[in-house]
Every structure is written in C-alpha cells, then in structure tokens.
Swiss-Prot record:
Keywords: Cell inner membrane, Cell membrane, Chaperone, Membrane, Protein transport, Transmembrane, Transmembrane helix, Transport. One of its GO terms (biological process) is protein insertion into membrane. GO terms for cellular component: plasma membrane. The keyword Chaperone applies. Residues 36-59 are annotated as: Disordered. It is a multi-pass membrane protein. It comes from Paraburkholderia xenovorans (strain LB400). Interacts with the Sec translocase complex via SecD. Specifically interacts with transmembrane segments of nascent integral membrane proteins during membrane integration. GO terms for molecular function: membrane insertase activity. CDD domains: 5TM_YidC_Alb3, EcYidC-like_peri. It comes from the Bacteria. Its main location: membrane. InterPro entries: Membr_insert_YidC, Membr_insert_YidC_N, YidC/ALB3/OXA1/COX18, YidC/Oxa/ALB_C, YidC_ALB_C, YidC_periplasmic_sf. This is Membrane protein insertase YidC.
Amino acid sequence: MDIKRTVLWVIFFMSAVMLFDNWQRDHGRPSMFFPSATPTRTVGSAAPGTTTPGTQPADLPATNAAAPGNAPAATQSQLIKFNTDVYSGEIDTRGGTLSKLSLVKQGDGKQPDLVITLFDRTANHTYLARTGLLGGDFPNHNDIYTPLPNQPHDLTGDEKSFQISFESPVKGGVKVIKTYTFTRGSYVIGVDTKIQNVGTTPVSPSVYMELVRDDQPVETPRFSHTFIGPAVYTDQHHFQKMTFGDIDKNKQDYATSADNGWIAMVQHYFASAWIPQQGAKRDIYVEKIDPALYRVGVKEPVPTIAPGQTVDVSARLFAGPEEERMLEGIAPGLELVKDYGWVTIIAKPLFWLLEKIHSYVGNWGWSIVLLTLLIKAVFFPLSAASYKSMARMKAITPRMQALRERFKGDPQKMNSALMELYKTEKVNPFGGCLPVVIQIPVFISLYWVLLSSVEMRGAPWILWIHDLSQQDPFFILPVLMAVSMFLQTKLNPTPPDPVQAKMMMFMPIAFSVMFFFFPAGLVLYYVVNNVLSIAQQYYITRMMGQAKTKAA
C-alpha cells in the first residue's frame, strides 16, 4: 500500500513538473530538461511573406519588404476599418489583406465585453489571411488594391450582412475584384475572387489562399502546453496537425493535394481556416517563410479564361472561437481544431455531457460541479474497492510496523512475515491500485476538456469567480484544494518511514502553490473531486468500522 501511494504521488508530481516545464517553454524560457537555442527575432529584417532562402516554392510571390507605414508615398496602402456584432477589424489595401481582426464577445451587463485580437500585423506579432493569383505576373498580396466607392463598413440596424470590395491594378492582362462578405452573428467570412481577363490573350492563373503567422502564443494558460500551429484536413487523411518545430526540422506530414477539406492555423481557444469550395482541386503547402514566420495555404487552379471573360472563385474564411457545435456546422472535421490530443475518444463525450448539464443549469461552474459528482457516482464501486483496501491496510499498520521493527536486520524474513500477515488478514497491498489506474484517463480527459473549452473564457461561477479560464483572484479555491489534500493524507495509512510521512504532509502545500496559477475552472474540478473522495473514503471507512464492531 505504501508503495502504491508513493508511486501515485510520484506520477502526480512528475506530471506537475512536466506541465510547469511546458509552461516555461511556452513563455520563451529555457526548458529545465531540454535546453535549446532560441532564434533571435529581428524586427524589420524581413516582412511577412519574405522567405528564408530555399524554402519558398518558385511560383509563390514574396512580400514587399516595406512594412505598412514605411512604403513610398506612391505605393502607400490604406487600412479600411469595419465592424460587425462579432468582429472589429481592418483590411489593408495592399493585397486587400485581412490584416487585423478582433473578436468581440458581448457582455451581459454583469460581465464586460471580451475582446481578443486574432489577426494582426505589428512589430511584435504577425497573423494574416491573404489571397492572390499565381501563374504569371498577376495581382497578388503585394499590389495596392482600390476600395470600391460608397460601401458600408459597419453592420447597422437590421442588416443581416454587408460587403466590402477591392479592385486590383491590371497586371498580365488580368484585373481582380476581391469581395469580403460579413454576416451578422457569424464567424465565417465569405471571400469572393472575381478574375477578369481584360487582355488580348487567354490566361490560366491559380488562386492562392493562405494564413501567415509567427510562433508567438496568444492567451496561453499557465502550467499547460496547448497546441499552436498549422493543421490540414482532408476526407482521405483526416486531421493532420504540425508544430512549428516540425516545420523547422522539415518533418511536417500532411496531404499535399485534395479536392475537399480545409487548412487552418490553430491556437488555444481560437482558430482560423480557409475553406475552399468542395470538389475544387487544390494543392496544399505548409512552410517556414522567415526566421519566425510560417504559412499554410492552398493553390487552386482556375480554368483558362478567354479575353473578355470572367471567372469567380469563392471560399469561406473562418476566424473565431473553437466552439464544437458551431464548428461542426461549418465544415466536416472543423471541430477537430479543438484538440484534446490522445484522450479525444474520452474527452469528446465528457464535453458533450458537460454541455448537456449546462443547457439545464445555465452556469459552467455548477456544470463542472455536477459533472464531477456524476463521474464520482459512476466510479463509486471502483473507489469503494480502493478505499476498502486502504482501510484494511490502515487497520493492520501497527502490526506491520511491529514486524518491520522486529525483523529490521533481516529484510528477507521481514518480507516473508509481511506476506503472511497480508494472507492472514486477506489484504492485497496493491488492491487499491487498479481502481485508481482505471479512473486516471477519465480525470486526465476532464482536465483537457476544461483547459481547452473556450466556453470557460469569461464564464462566471459565483461571487468572486468571474472567469473560469483565469486564476482565482483571491486564491480561495487553491487554499481549499490544499486543505482537502491535507485531510486526505490524514485519512490514509501513515507511512512507516518518517521521511515519507513528512513528504506526504508537504505535498498539499507544494501542490496548492502550483494550483494558485491554474484556471479557476480546473481548480474547482479538483476541489470538488477531492471533497467527494474524502466523503466517500470517510463513509466507507466508517461502515467497515461499524461492521467490524458488530462482528466482534
């Protein structure tokens, strides 16, 4: 029993250490275990789209090195601002590029509005959605587009949608009219590329649609490493994600061509994705284009356009929160950007159940409490077996200590005597281990559900907890966590080794300090789980004591 408890504590402690190490690396600090050189970012050395030599396919255009605001007056671009009920953003006339996009979650009066900037182009951060033409000297994201006159830039009144269109200069006998369609309440932007052949010879361009960003995380929670990087989905190969480290090492693995699916950039809570027309053949590319910039995109060939003819290429651009039900309705497989890792098969049903509970109680905090209670009820038989084993071990602990003292000079005889004691009392020292091990994947899955669900962002619980995705502002839950862990150690058998006993007493303090920085929703889950475990253990131990008294 002592060995089992020690092993479980060691596993728990090592997991916590690894989470802390991931947090270190997420925040640009050296790993405690795998130190490595960090590439230096040099502001102004390369603009978005400029590639490291040898990394860019010959047919993809490079970006003009002049950053916005530094270009010559003749080629100075403008920023066209727009607003909807869910977006606030800017479109750069250089390329008609969506260069800034802030997501706005309206408050309910009690809670303030929540705003996060997803797309942006500054000296410290780059994240863009851009398009253009390939296959000749055609308009691309480097050219200055002209916004069409008399266009609305805001969603007002009862309007359901509005459009903003941009016209390119004529290049290679081709003119492009790019139109963005914004819809009320929607995180999907329609992007229409109208290609007009105004020349005298046929042309056969390709349209590229790409997402470009640096490797800087946004709103990453402490003590956790959530995925950030590009992803590709096709019906044939399903969901394929790549870390920026994979791309650095040229180890990215993904489908390079398809006629379905989408490409995306994924980060904690939020994602963006280009969703081309299904059935249209396209090539897919993922690459590093600068010491700290990466891109994922598609190239879609266009049928030959005769002089005077026009071809439309339509696509959808998703940019928003990773809300599973919404994502399922946008495109097949898009809900997979909410990444649970290896516990997906358990985590998805748990989140579904959490959603169902929330649909009745209307509060994510109470939903966590009720889901934890439900899980503990399901696992009660297994927990009971574990606690009964612990109770039996606690009952014979004085006799075990006496045997250890008696045979402390002869380990072989001591082990033989202990085995005989276990046999006589019908106690298995590892009897409580299997029930605990079976439950571990479920509790790990619930951890990732709470960590990955954007629904927790800005969600209040009670009184002082106004955001379950942020740490407890007054550290009340971490203190309750420490108290509950301390009570659990008191209910368990006292280790015979004084050093081990002191370590067990120190553990609640160590973990409570770490949990001070965990999201409140996670700490709430652990507190409720511990309280229920204490109640179960106390009840079972008391019942066994009463049964023993009656038998006597």
